[in-house]
Amino acid sequence: MARHSFIQMSKLPNVKGRISYITSHARQENLYATYRTADNAFWNNLARESRQEFQRSGAEGKCIEARELIIALPEVYTQYEPQQVLEDFTDEFRRRYGVECVSALHHNKRKTNYHICLLYTS
């Protein structure tokens, strides 16, 4: 039975923690590939500057440091090399929207299709 792809978006108040979680083989049982368009220093600076700007603004609630898309891919993508799928998708997203990204390619629990966790600057 063919399944449809879907996208879920979340706001991230702790981008460094989320990067650690989605890219960790110890925490992700079905992790096949990871990819970054910027190094750790970039993400550390982004988190620090976002928190500083949030404090200066006096806004209520949580500071949003980045955003995440969880994208379920059609089953046909399991036929392709995982690292290449992830890099092609992430590079196109970066080119199209002009944002830095961290991404990880996982299988769903039933191992029927891949999904990409894509963190990006907002």
PLM region spans:
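N-terminal nicking endonuclease/strand-transfer module with a His-rich metal-binding environment
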Residues: 1-122
